[in-house]
Amino acid sequence: LPQIPEDLALAGITELVKLEQEWVPSAKDTSLYIRPFMVGLDAALGVHSSHHCQYIVIVCPVGAYYPEGLDPVKIYVEDQDVRAVKGGTGMAKTGGNYAASLRAGDRAEANGYSQVLWLDGVHRKYIEEVGSMNVMFKIAGKILTPDLNGSVLPGITRRSCIQLLKDWGYEVEERRISAEELFEAAENGTLEEAWGTGTAAVISPIGEMGWEGRHVVVNGGEIGSLTHKLYDTLVGIQWGTEPDPYGWTIQL
């Protein structure tokens, strides 16, 4: 599929939002969700790349992602299925990645968990994402997040968090993190906070984790102060109540 030039995509989205401005909600923590996507249109049954495609942008008013406030989620480390592998499409927002995640999601839900913590597809030991989000951990005062190894999505919210954290003076390491390292940190008390990052939720705090019969609680099951600060800052920048020195927002 062709790559849409950034200036053309932004111009199109801007005009669409202006056209549909009556649908922009004004209540606290609500938003107009914008989703660009592209589909192949070749009228053929064979398996091959598309020569014709359509670029579409849809918008939809959405309510507060956390209507009752930020609540930490319980996550289950998935060591059977994988969402993507290096050399595949894990670094892209493709529908196939979601399809590969459904069975594990059902299994986690059946065990009382709300999200899946994905491991890599080769060694089945290194953490990659949580649900459909990037993931970060505060361990011994340092921020750790899986590196972009070809099967991890280079999320915009992830990038924004890294920028903010560095500006706040935190050391951020992008590297391989094993599930064993994470659980050892939780068990010895050095895992201070954990959260997912993504467009819809912005920040999703993690309160409990389960893996191979082990169960750990993060920060007493409460939202950490840094997790909350990231959420408040990002949402504040989106709403214009916090300064935006990075030029992340466009005022229409």
Where are these regions (language model features)?
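Active-site loop segments of alpha/beta catalytic cores
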Residues: Q21-P25, H48
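Helix-start/capping segments and mature chain N-termini
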Residues: P2-Q3, L8, G12, L16, ...
